[in-house]
């Protein structure tokens, strides 16, 4: 397949490309690219291992340099956006701008999902002595982003100095207990306050946001839940691992960190990609919808901004007779040791996803395939066969229920076993067929 993830180091106009770091840390463009390349490979391998643990094989995405051998492991992208303007923009606006700019550039392609890091992110510094919340820390940070959806996962670089430049430095970086100088540098460590915590939380955030570009929604637990900032526990053993704590929503993790989600639609009969990022913060915050401006290389549906509080899965679905059985639930429930896992629905969706499978020989088949959801009859029809159906809360992307079909011969029809109620929240039906086509309908 030619489908790939493309790591980028985005340098704004008027910026020298050096990321913020202490004076004893190499913050050059080459150093940034080395750190991003190592991080991308870590996520690539971790994706495969965690899918293997779910019993679907070691599947993962390809990186740009594995497809185009002449390309570097991390591409430097010179943006036309002025650095001063970028530092005044909200992360949703940065996501929209860079997404549009990338698609209109020579790199623009529907065969790429971009993993971008903004060089000019800057923590302005503070004299505040009291501990700050994540939102307060972000308010002191310019050109900050941690947002994924559609074809772009975008991040700031305020903690990139805590990342390793080589494979041999990975474990020492996770184990680095040096306190963050939180008056001069961003502390995005899940409230652990260490350089190792910053590396773990920000790498885990990249893992989570990249998952949204692969059409994953939020889950109560696991990688697409709130466990991702303990990613260091996958690589460390014994007493050296960071301890798991619970937040006030009874979730295992460090502390509240930022989440985002995406609403992506693909029309099966025509080529159309629809993407919107949905920013989801800590348990007492709000969610905010952003949107792409129209692109020449893809159809974008615009939606007006919507602000809504975060909701957890509703108990209204607890009585559904066809709810997923115990055998379909997560095989890696949080046990105090490993909160980093794909829930079963995420594993199934990824295992059939176009970015995780060989495209050759399936493209001609896909032309004649039919995938449709009849909202009136609550009936899904797929000529290729249905592999997974998810019911999500449209406001925050939370997966409320899922139905997986992993037998060799998948279902061609599926009647969603509930009806919409005027009092219920707005729901989105997400369907993936045997060829990896994804349909979303609200």
Describe these PLM feature segments:
Residues 48, 52, 215-219, 229:
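Short amphipathic alpha-helices and their capping/turn residues within compact interaction modules
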Residues 200-217:
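Active-site recognition of the HExxH zinc-binding catalytic motif
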Residues 20-23, 167, 218, 236-239:
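Short coil/turn segments at secondary-structure boundaries
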Residues 14-18, 124-126, 162-164, 221-223, ...:
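Eukaryotic short linear interaction motifs
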Residues 1-152, 157-158, 201, 399-407:
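Propeptide-to-catalytic entry region of secreted or membrane-anchored zinc metalloproteases
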Residues 436-442:
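Edge beta-strands of extracellular beta-sandwich domains
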Residues 126-196:
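Active-site scaffold of zinc-dependent metalloenzymes
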